[in-house]
Structure formats: C-alpha cells, structure tokens
Amino acid sequence: MKFLDEAKVYVRSGDGGAGCVSFRREKFIEFGGPDGGDGGRGGDVWAECVEGLNTLIDYRYQQHFKAKKGEHGSGRNRAGAKGGDVVLKVPAGTQILAEDRETLVADLTRVGQRVLLARGGNGGFGNAYFTTSTNRAPRHANPGQEGQEHWLWLRLKLIADAGLVGLPNAGKSTFLATVTAAKPKIADYPFTTLHPGLGVVRVDTREFVLADIPGLIEGAHEGVGLGDRFLAHVERCRVLLHLVEGTSEDAGAAYRLVRAELEAYGHGLADKPEIVALSKADILDPERLEAQVASLEAACGRRPLVISAATRRGVPEALRALLAAMDRAQAEAAPEKAEAWQP
C-alpha cells in the first residue's frame, strides 16, 4: 500500500430542504387550513478514526466530499427526510487542520473517535408553522439554510511507543525487521526507507509499537535529502532509539549531527528520553569498536549500547532499555491523583 501522510480535502454539508406551502383539501371541509410540512435538515460531514488504516492514500484520488441535501416538506404536514451524511475514514493519529495549516480542528488518536466537520443546514418551516390568531391561512414558507463548506488539511502522525532515528544506513530498518514481523526494504545505499514503517515488538510478556522513519542528513530541517517532514511521525513517541552506524568515520560526529537536526525541528523531540546504541558491531574489529564507543560516549555523555541486528548482539538489552524508559516516561506523565475529600 502506498503511503501518504498529508492531504487537502473540501467538505460541504447538505442544504436544508424548503418548507412547503400547502392547504388541507378534503370533501366537506370548507376551510381546511395550512398543512405544509417543514423541510428536512441537510446531511453532515464527519471524520471518523477507524482500525486497519495507516495512510491517507485514499484522499489522493478523491478530495471533494459533499453531503446530501435535505428533502423538501410536503402537504399533510409531512416533513422532508434528512439528507445523508458523509463520513471521512482516517487512521489513528490523524490531525485535522484548517486551510491555514496551523489551526488545529481535531486530533483523532483513538479508534471510534468522531468529529463533526460541517453541520447540515436546517430545513425551512412550512406554512403551517406561521399560523397565528390573525393569519389563519399563511401563504409563505421558509427556504432551507445553506450548508457549511471548508477546505481542510488531513495530517497523519503515526502513533507508536518508540521511534528509531539516525542517519541513512544506520541499520534502522534492519533493526525493525529483526525485532518485529515488519518487512521494510533493506539495501546498502542511502534512503532505502522512503516512508515511515511500524512494527509490533514483543519483549517477554509485553508488547509495544516501534516506528522507523527515513534517515536524516545535515540540513534536513532546510529540506535537504528527504527533509525532516517524517519527524512528525515520532512526535507522539515516548522514547527514541538513536542508532549510530559503527562503520561511520566518527560515531560521535554522526550522533551530534542528528541531535542538531532534532533540535532544529523542535516540537519537543530533542527533549524526549533517548537510548543511544552503536549499530553494526559485528563487522568491527575490537580496537575499532572500542574507539567508536569512546567517541560516541564522549558525544552523548553516557555509555552507549553496542548492538548488531544481524547477529542479535545487544538487541534484547536495547529492547528492555526501551521498555524501562517508556515506563519512566509514562510514570512522569501520569497526573497525580488528588486526595479524597474527608469531612
């Protein structure tokens, strides 16, 4: 399935149906009086978070969504039927923004969440509504109200517990394929990963979702390479696993480069808990490995993990470190319970 994480859509709710001008006509009833019914309300436009989706690709092929108009009222006090609704189905993690791309309309993070995007117009009153003590036969009715229309942006931010960051070819996709059932494209050239991927990690008796995004390079926040637009998909992660390629010239410099891009991007990414690991340890000789570990330790200020996704060296330790960091982050984010009132 192709991946799309941003789409622009036009939504319009249905117009309300017009009220009816009608009079009761029956045998032996000389003055039947007005019996025009009200118009039906126009259909609404909703957005609903559904299970089984992880892309907005459907909105590349259809951008206009219009609900049905309400039906007109008719005689014998019959009201018009309500217009049919339109529902935009989106994956969990979808943000809905106004046309200016800054005003947040809704943030759908749970399956089953619904938000009203455009309310249908009210139906007009029939002439029976306007009957008064001085006007027993009104000959006018209301037209229905017009529906609402908007241009909106849909922006997907994948929901994962932990995210992988690093330079291209740091081994992120290999790590994801090793610890989950995901099958990302893996090759020995930069930018093999062109869109984010998700996988479910099982550690002992627990599970969490891990996200892999395309690699960052120097100047990514200015649009160099694939840019930093995919960093939005790790904004919701509680913890980052920063992989640094062991075969790079200087592991410490590679680490600092990615950290600089995270800080330039903002949105709190640089402040998230981070597990640092030196990858591809299986192809380094002991002397070179120790030098890279020392360089990385000097850059990040703590002893990094040493892993190899190919041989699974250090992988269980990295996963357990992620779990522990997630537990700490969740405990810090949990609001303190207020003490119960006692007389």
From Swiss-Prot:
Residues 160-327 form the OBG-type G domain. It comes from the Bacteria. SUPFAM superfamilies: Obg GTP-binding protein N-terminal domain (SSF82051), P-loop containing nucleoside triphosphate hydrolases (SSF52540). Its cofactor is Mg(2+). One of its GO terms (cellular component) is cytoplasm. One of its GO terms (biological process) is ribosome biogenesis. GTP binds at residues 166-173, 191-195, 212-215, 279-282, 308-310. InterPro entries: G_OBG, GTP-bd, GTP-bd_Obg/CgtA, GTP1-OBG_CS, GTP1_OBG_dom, GTP1_OBG_dom_sf, OBG_GTPase, P-loop_NTPase. Keywords: Cytoplasm, GTP-binding, Hydrolase, Magnesium, Metal-binding, Nucleotide-binding. Its main location: cytoplasm. Mg(2+) binds at residues 173, 193. Its EC number is 3.6.5.-. Residues 1-159 form the Obg domain. The keyword Cytoplasm applies. One of its GO terms (molecular function) is GTPase activity. It is found in: Cytoplasm. Monomer. Belongs to the TRAFAC class OBG-HflX-like GTPase superfamily. OBG GTPase family. An essential GTPase which binds GTP, GDP and possibly (p)ppGpp with moderate affinity, with high nucleotide exchange rates and a fairly low GTP hydrolysis rate. Plays a role in control of the cell cycle, stress response, ribosome biogenesis and in those bacteria that undergo differentiation, in morphogenesis control. PANTHER family: DEVELOPMENTALLY REGULATED GTP-BINDING PROTEIN-RELATED, MITOCHONDRIAL RIBOSOME-ASSOCIATED GTPASE 2. This is GTPase Obg.
